[in-house]
């Protein structure tokens, strides 16, 4: 196999494959990328067993077709630090010669036969079709409450994907809070739901961020995997073998107090009050009285206290309630809307952070 490579263009594709490898695995083959070259194009394949990717490499001219498995640890640095804008790769019998200007490097590849066969979406069913921008938004909002570590029960570090009536809903929880977001999709299989691990979802987010927001994304599924197809790549995430709790039963109903206000003003005020409480208990108190001002207070013993007044539209019952400033801030910042509605169902109930006049978050 012999390839001529435009470094800048190729590294964009290579970085996608590189992130899907495993740096901690005892199996060297999982810390590698399979390169398959034909005169029709070049594909890159990588996996850490839980996730995998197949993508078309850009910036590559195929002189001689072939395939090889490149170890990530050293090769990635060589690709990135090779001098000039172009270099060549010449692979013969497991040995590679990389030439860039006057520089020349030799290294070995792994056996192609040892590279695992990646999951295939050929027999997979359609889950839904949605634009990259809409999918990125619903993932960011819907996974807000998921735990970042690998916790047990497994659903705590996962997010539930489900389709119903043409809506893709994503839900997550860490038992202290619950996030739910939905978006209309082009096509969908109603009634399908699955748990996906946050590690894989985070990589989907990174991929979506690199795409045009209008780019169509096709999501497919089978009993073991979810497949995300977009432009010239397919990313696969293994499903979590667990069930998400029946969250519908704990959703707050019958709100009695509503506060609508500018999201940016609320975030700024909360950040200032958080300066006082963040090293204590991170609790802020909201004084809500029917009218046009929301009062926010924070207090830390032996340090000080803060009080903010924010213009708002308030309706319903008067209320004083304490909330966690960190959780409150995260919910406000994940929303992209200029305004936000806070809904309450009493002092001992929950607070819901919602879009104004919408139930999509």
Where are these regions (language model features)?
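Structural preference for solvent-exposed beta-strand-turn elements
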Residues: 1-361
């Amino acid at each position: 196999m012999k390839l001529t490579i435009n470094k800048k263009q190729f590294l964009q594709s290579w970085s996608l494959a590189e992130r899907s490898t495993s740096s901690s695995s005892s199996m060297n083959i999982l810390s590698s990328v399979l390169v398959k070259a034909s005169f029709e194009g070049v594909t890159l394949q990588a996996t850490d067993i839980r996730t995998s990717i197949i993508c078309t490499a850009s910036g590559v001219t195929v002189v001689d077709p072939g395939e090889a498995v490149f170890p990530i640890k050293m090769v990635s640095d060589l690709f990135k630090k090779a001098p000039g804008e172009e270099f060549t790769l010449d692979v013969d019998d497991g040995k590679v010669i990389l030439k860039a200007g006057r520089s020349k490097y030799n290294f070995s590849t792994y056996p192609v036969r040892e590279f695992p066969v990646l999951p295939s979406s050929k027999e997979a069913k359609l889950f839904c079709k949605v634009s990259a921008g809409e999918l990125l938004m619903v993932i960011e909002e819907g996974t807000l409450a998921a735990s970042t570590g690998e916790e047990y029960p497994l659903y705590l570090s996962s997010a539930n994907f489900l389709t119903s009536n043409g809506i893709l809903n994503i839900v997550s929880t860490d038992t202290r809070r619950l996030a739910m977001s939905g978006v209309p999709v082009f096509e969908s299989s109603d009634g399908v739901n699955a748990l996906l691990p946050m590690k894989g979802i985070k990589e989907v987010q990174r991929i979506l961020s690199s795409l045009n927001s209008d780019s169509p994304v096709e999501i497919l599924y089978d009993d073991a995997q979810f497949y995300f197809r977009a432009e010239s790549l397919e990313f696969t995430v293994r499903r979590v073998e667990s069930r998400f709790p029946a969250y519908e039963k704990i959703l707050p109903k019958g709100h009695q107090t509503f506060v609508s206000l500018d999201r940016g003003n609320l975030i700024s005020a909360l950040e200032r009050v958080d300066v006082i409480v963040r090293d204590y208990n991170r609790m802020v108190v909201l004084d809500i009285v029917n009218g046009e001002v929301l009062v926010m207070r924070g207090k830390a013993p032996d340090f000080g206290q803060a009080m903010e007044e924010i213009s708002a539209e308030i309706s319903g019952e008067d209320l004083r309630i304490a909330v966690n400033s960190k959780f409150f801030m995260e919910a406000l910042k994940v929303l992209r809307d200029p305004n936000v509605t806070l809904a309450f169902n009493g002092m001992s109930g929950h607070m819901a952070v919602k879009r104004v006049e919408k139930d999509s978050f």
